[in-house]
Regions:
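N-terminal catalytic or cofactor-binding beta/alpha core of small enzyme domains
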Residues: 2-422
Length: 422
């Protein structure tokens, strides 16, 4: 491949759409035709755009260029777009989606908002230092509306109808504690489920079954990724050194997909509800996984926190609460069947993140900053990831009912149900 050109560590103020479909020259389709157009790949942390309007604080004073530079270099997933493009090409895809907005300005991998002081890394919000404490309200609001919401809409369109979403990231060699990170890590479990056996209360609607957060992708695919890459001499970890924060697109995608599926199932059983404004209001609230709809937030607070609605909305909220209780009763009556049907369905939408260490695919300077991409190594890792997906689609996607009954998925580990703290 030859030596790659030196990287620029500079960001740009030249605006582009916050998310772009990056075209690639695809290889011939390497898996069954039924999976054509069922895979999407995205990169959300390799952007380089910081619009000029956000370089000054709420009083019009310039934000420190040094602080922005440090955050930009540290936060960016250097090389992720190269890896994603190579995977997309190998999988016969025509494009992947890349967020152009710099992560240090806006992190689409978190819930919208401004990070509170002292928040741990996995509990951050979308707007972080050095911008979190410098932007005025109007700036932060515009940033979310013109970037976060635009990215979200494009992602929704890209993901809808897909079977598999792959999020490509790169990370530093060392944890903040100084321990070395794995060369490659596959992330497919929600943080809250790992820590407490359930998602944090109030993040998503309680109707979402916590057990679905145990894994965001068929277990065989991470295992296939590990086997494929380990055979090629690349050590792989799973769900380490961290897990998926609840605000990650992968977890939000899982919750949205379940409620979208449940809506169709419920409406099949109760077709008279399909055009009801009250039921439409409830489904909109349940699928507001980005926490961006004001009316959904009001209904959520009305149902779960007994907040008083504005008087002119009182009847609409009361009707919506009745609809919510109907959906709740339906889910409880059919709990085991619904969860089992969805959880192990061959058509359950899947998503996972994959992390590749930055030092494996870059030459670094004495400060640990990327100087030049090492394309041969980056391509080898990307091809290994793609080959694992191909093998999974062509060989591993078999029905689950071939197991010995003794091995049936009925324990707390496998469900259905089994939420320990409910």
């Amino acid at each position: 491949m030859g030596q790659a050109p030196a990287l620029s560590l500079e960001w740009t103020t030249q605006t582009r759409p916050p998310i772009e479909a990056v075209a690639v020259d695809p290889d011939p389709l390497p898996y069954p035709e039924e999976y054509r157009d069922r895979i999407t790949i995205d990169v959300i942390h390799d952007g380089d755009v910081i619009p000029e309007e956000y370089l000054v604080d709420g009083r019009g004073r310039p934000i420190s260029r040094d602080a922005i530079d440090r955050a930009y270099i540290h936060e960016r997933d250097w090389g992720a777009s190269f890896v994603a493009g190579r995977i997309a090409r190998r999988l016969g895809l025509e494009c992947f989606h890349n967020v152009t907005t710099a992560r240090c300005l806006l992190d689409f991998g978190r819930f919208p908002g401004v990070t509170r002081p002292g928040a741990p890394h996995l509990r951050r919000s979308a707007i972080n230092l050095p911008f979190a404490d410098r932007l005025r309200f109007a700036q932060a609001r515009r940033l979310l509306e013109e970037h976060y919401d635009v990215i979200s809409k494009a992602m929704d369109e890209a993901i809808r109808g897909k079977l598999l979403k792959i999020a490509v990231h790169t990370y530093d060699r060392y944890n903040p504690s100084g321990t070395e990170r794995p060369q490659v890590s596959v992330i497919s479990r929600a943080l809250g489920y790992q820590m407490d056996g359930e998602l944090p209360y109030g993040v998503f609607d309680p109707l979402y079954p916590d057990i679905l957060a145990e894994f965001t992708v068929d277990r065989m695919l991470p295992s296939r990724l590990s086997l494929q890459l380990e055979r090629q001499g690349m050590p792989v970890a799973q769900n380490y050194p961290y897990l998926l924060p609840e605000g990650s697109p992968e977890v939000r995608h899982q919750v949205w997909s379940f409620f979208d599926w449940l809506e169709a199932r419920f409406q099949t059983a109760h077709p008279d509800t399909e055009t009801s404004p009250a039921y439409q209001f409830v489904w909109r609230m349940l699928k507001d996984t980005n926490m961006r709809l004001g009316d959904a937030g009001m209904l959520r607070a009305y149902i779960h926190r007994f907040r008083r609605p504005p008087s002119y909305y009182a009847q609409a909220f009361s009707n919506a609460e009745d609809a919510y209780r109907h959906i709740e009763r339906y889910l409880r009556r059919n709990h085991d069947a619904v969860i089992s049907e969805y959880r192990f369905s061959a058509e359950r939408p899947m998503s996972f993140g994959i992390e590749v260490r930055k030092d494996l695919i870059h030459e670094l300077d004495h400060l640990g900053r990327p100087v030049r991409l090492v394309p041969e190594r980056a391509a080898r890792i990307a091809d290994g990831i793609a080959d694992a997906v191909i093998t999974y689609l062509t060989e591993d996607r078999v029905p689950h009912d071939f197991h010995d009954p003794v091995m049936a998925r009925t324990s707390r580990w496998y469900g259905p149900g089994g939420e320990p703290n409910k």
